[in-house]
Amino acid sequence: MTAFHKIILSFLVAFILTLPAGAAELRLEDFFKGRTSATGSFGTITGYSRQFDVSLHGRWDGRTLVLREDFRYDDGEKDTKTWRFRKTGWNTYIGTREDVLGEAKVILAGDKAYFNYLVDLDEGEGRNIVRFYDKLTLSADGQTIVNTARVFKGPLPVAWVRVDFKR
């Protein structure tokens, strides 16, 4: 090994040793199994906003996480949604929910999860289809997840969501 290669190798080792310790690995079934609570907000480009609290209960059967979400909005309205996340690989899931059109494909990457899905916001006979792009980030201590989502109508961003989950 030449002197040049030894110097490069030394710098590389020094660089690797100065990197921060790895963050907690996100696994949906580990975080959401059992009881979880959350607070969140939804805002649109027109200025409409809405706050909510969520009580969650997750059941894991070794392959599928069933995650019931009981919403209570600041105006008193209540709603319940149930996600079903089927694990399809070490870092992938397929998710379904009552108001989701088709499936949400979920990809985990370290302390983060990424997924997107279509939702029909109009519960009546009309259609108001938007696409959510969610990013979940697990805290270093593994006790909280911050979910930030962008909402698009076609190519246009129309809303955003933030939800803070706590174990």
Regions from the PLM with identified roles:
Residues 8-18:
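Bacterial N-terminal signal peptides
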Residues 39-125, 133-137:
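Central antiparallel beta-sheet cores of small beta-barrel/beta-sandwich binding domains
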Residues 23-35, 135:
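N-terminal helix-cap/turn-to-beta initiation motif at the start of protein domains
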Residues 32-40, 147:
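A short, Trp-centered hydrophobic/proline-enriched beta-strand micro-motif
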Residues 33-35, 64, 142:
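Extracellular Ig-like/FN3 beta-sandwich strand-entry sites
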Residues 131-167:
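Glycine-rich, aromatic-bearing surface loops/beta-hairpins
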Residues 1-9:
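Bacterial N-terminal signal peptides that target proteins for export
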